[in-house]
Curated annotation (Swiss-Prot):
GO molecular function, one term: microtubule binding
Family (UniProt): Belongs to the NDC80/HEC1 family.
Record region (Disordered): 57-76, 105-138
Keyword Nucleotide-binding attached: no
Coiled coil: 327-492, 586-690
Organism for this UniProt entry: Aspergillus fumigatus (strain ATCC MYA-4609 / CBS 101355 / FGSC A1100 / Af293) (Neosartorya fumigata)
Gene Ontology biological process terms, A to Z: attachment of mitotic spindle microtubules to kinetochore; cell division; mitotic sister chromatid biorientation
Protein name: Probable kinetochore protein ndc80
Taxonomic superkingdom: Eukaryota
Regions of compositional bias (Polar residues) in chain numbering: 57-70
Length: 736
């Protein structure tokens, strides 16, 4: 068996259980529990809410954990590394206790290393790292830390169809896993649509027990749920408050339904992980979990069998309990290594075949330098041909566009030529039909020249007239722009003086806003006598009609000389009256201000007197401050001296307190031992007293029986001596 145990070398490394955190669901012995009342160790994270079963933890007679040692490297265990690797040694045990045998279970025997190890106890089974020690890669199930702030749930939790789907999945999961049988609580089809607080509590407890079976809910749900969600790293736990947990129905239910569905998926994932469904995915990601599974099975089985032994069990028997587990683990590792060896042989064969192919190709291949040179030449030719093709393609597009343009021009010229031919033919035919002679043609040409000259003179006069019209038009446009600017200034002043709009304070319901009644229509050539080129479109707004301008009275929308002027004069009169009243009020306020200034001067003189007193008080304050500072320095020196003495006293007191705590713990241990010894002595005394009472009773019965025999003997003797005097003898006997 020792040789089988030695075959574990170069396979795995077992760390001491003292340094391996308690990441299993197996309960720790009572000796491994920290006692915060006597030792000032702080609780590890989440242990205040994540409490294990107290029925298993309070057993005071539970033996200590085994100590599995390993070498720091992957080499052999050595000659003494067989079953001694699991020997319970005092020097390497997590409880560095007494000199020989099993270490003391007293809390005072804990060392600093065991304290740090107890602080590292796990808070739940789902967060354990690999027990195979630190690895060179990241875990396949490592979660990325959440971003700061409250994240937004991307799931459509408010969608009725989505709620129905995840609710049905959750209900099927609860039904398949015997929720009603375990929780003794019935579920209906509408439970996940309008649940009660009790339904939510039972469902949450059931789902979390699927994740961590050893957890015990000891507080209210609003106090238990937030730490659990934070510990599980629920991405949206910051959006769930205690008040919402106390009332899960109504508008809050979609949020809690999504949270319960997430817990269900987490439980399903853990079940699949336990069944090994993710092993292939882990292997694809480069994470081998088979070794972790073998070690975990070894630790759980060995720990279970080790717990079966009592406290009085010797080390040799404990080692014999672990031998089958070590052999089983060695066989599992050997089977795994055989698979890896087969894969390695296949890969080595493939590697050799590929190397042979490479060598053969290198032998048969031509000179690589020539091929590279030829390849570079071909690449250069390819680049040149591509440039040439791009150049030719550009020329092709250019010539195609030019051809299209020339074809269009040819078509236009041909159309014009055809129209001219048709016109010439029509004119020739009309001339032939009229029968015009040569004299008529000469006369018509002379008349045409005269009319042409008259047209040119008329056109010149029209140009001059048009120039004068354009000047007048430009002047009218400038005047119109000036008028528009004046109207804008008027309207601006009207807005400033609260005259515009009609709802303003000074308008009194009248509209004082000016606007120009300018025609925006553009007259066509038919309206202005068929001369579109002689009158600009910009001058259309200067005309009320095609050939008529605006009348001054019709250009503005208000009667400025009549209604507007009288209204403004009335407003000016009213404003003057208000101005006079304001001036009178201002004079009164100025008089009041003068009186206030006189009073302020008097107060200022009083303030100056008080300032003089203040300066005197400040001088007195500075003098007292210097005295106080001197006294403070002296007192600080005294305080510093007293603080040093106090620190020394505190150090002494701390040592004394530690000694007293140690003495108290030793006294408690001695008290427990004395109590046990007293109980045993009491039992022994009770047994001895009972035995003595039995002896006394037997002795009494024996004496009584002897007296009775002696009495009968005496009676017989008396009867024989006295003969028939039997009554007298009976009287004597009765008196006796």
């Amino acid at each position: 068996m020792r040789s089988d145990g030695l075959r574990l070398t170069n396979i795995f490394l077992i760390q001491t259980l003292g340094s391996v955190q308690n990441y299993s669901a197996l309960p720790q012995p009572s000796s491994a529990l920290k006692r915060t009342s006597s030792i000032g160790y702080q609780n590890p994270p989440f242990t205040s809410q994540h409490t294990r079963s107290m029925s298993l933890l309070n057993s005071a007679s539970r033996p200590q954990q085994p100590n599995f040692q390993r070498s720091s490297s992957g080499g052999a265990f050595g000659a003494d590394a067989g079953l001694s690797s699991v020997r319970r040694s005092v020097s390497s045990n997590i409880f560095h206790g007494a000199s020989v045998g099993r270490p003391s279970y007293a809390p005072g025997s804990l060392s600093a290393s065991s304290a740090s190890q107890s602080l590292q106890r796990r808070s739940s089974v789902f967060s354990r790292p690999s027990v195979g020690g630190p690895m060179g890669h990241q875990s396949f199930f490592t979660q990325v830390p959440n971003a700061a702030g409250v994240p937004r749930d991307p799931r459509p939790l408010r969608d009725r169809s989505f709620q129905a789907r995840i609710g049905q999945e959750l209900l099927e999961y609860l039904t398949h896993n015997n929720f009603e049988l375990e929780m003794k609580h019935s579920l209906g089809q509408n439970t996940l649509r309008s649940p009660t607080q009790k339904d939510f509590n039972y469902i949450f407890q059931f789902l979390y027990h699927r994740i961590d079976p050893g957890y015990r809910f000891q507080k209210s749900m609003d106090a238990e749920v937030p730490p659990i969600l934070k510990q599980l790293r629920y991405p949206f736990e910051k959006g769930i408050t205690k008040s919402q947990i106390a009332a899960v129905g109504g508008q809050n239910w979609p949020t809690f339904l999504g949270m319960l569905h997430w817990l269900m998926q987490l439980a399903q994932m853990m079940d699949r992980f336990v069944l090994g469904e993710y092993d292939e995915a882990c292997a694809e990601m480069g994470v081998d979990v088979s070794g972790d599974r073998i070690i975990f099975r070894f630790l759980t089985g060995a720990y279970h069998d080790w717990l079966q032994g009592g406290e009085d069990e010797d080390d040799e028997t404990a080692e014999k309990r672990l031998v089958p587990h070590i052999e089983s683990m060695a066989q599992e590792f050997e089977r795994g290594n055989e698979k890896y060896m087969q894969e390695m042989q296949v890969l080595e064969a493939e590697n050799r075949a590929l190397r042979d192919q490479i060598e053969e190709l290198e032998k048969n291949a031509p000179d690589m330098a020539k091929l590279d040179k030829h390849f570079r030449i071909l690449e250069d030719d390819k680049r040149k041909f591509e440039d040439y093709n791009q150049n030719v393609q550009g020329k092709i597009e250019k010539y195609e566009n030019r051809i299209k343009f020339l074809e269009e021009e040819i078509q236009k010229v041909e159309a014009e030529l055809q129209a001219a031919e048709e016109e010439r033919s029509s004119l020739q035919s009309s001339v032939d039909q009229q029968g015009i002679t040569i004299q008529d043609i000469d006369r018509m040409n002379t008349e045409r020249d005269r009319l042409q000259k008259s047209l040119e003179d008329t056109t010149a006069r029209l140009e001059e007239t048009h120039a004068r019209v354009m000047e007048k038009e430009a002047e009218a446009s400038r005047k119109l722009e000036d008028l528009e600017e004046i109207v804008k200034v008027y309207n601006t002043l009207g807005y400033q003086t609260s005259l515009i709009p009609s709802t303003a304070v000074n308008a009194k319901g009248q509209d004082y806003e000016l606007s120009l009644n300018i025609n925006d229509n553009s007259f066509s050539a038919s309206q202005i006598g068929g001369l579109p080129n002689r009158i600009s479109s910009e001058a259309d707004r200067l005309l009320a009609e095609p050939f008529t301008g605006y009348h001054p009275a019709h250009l503005l929308n208000l009667d400025l000389r009549g209604m507007v002027r009288s209204s403004l004069q009335a407003l000016r009169k009213e404003i003057n009256e208000r101005r006079k009243r304001a001036i009178d009020d201002d004079l009164e306020r100025r008089n009041l201000l003068d009186n206030i200034k006189e009073a302020m001067d008097e107060k200022r003189s009083e303030v100056e007197a008080l300032e003089h007193k203040r300066r005197a008080a400040e001088e007195e304050f500075e003098r007292l401050k210097e005295i106080t500072t001197t006294q403070k320095l002296a007192s600080d020196a005294q305080i510093e001296k007293m603080e040093k003495e106090l620190a020394k006293m505190r150090a002494t007191l701390s040592e004394s307190v530690q000694l007293m705590e140690q003495r108290e713990m030793n006294t408690n241990i001695e008290y427990e031992q004395l109590t046990l010894r007293a109980n045993a002595l009491r039992e022994e005394l009770h047994t001895n007293v009972e035995s003595m009472l039995n002896d006394v009773i037997r002795f009494k019965v024996h004496i009584q029986k002897g007296l009775e025999d002696y009495e009968s003997f005496v009676v017989d003797e008396v009867e024989q001596e006295l003969g028939g005097d039997l009554p007298a003898t009976k009287d004597v006997t009765s008196q006796t």
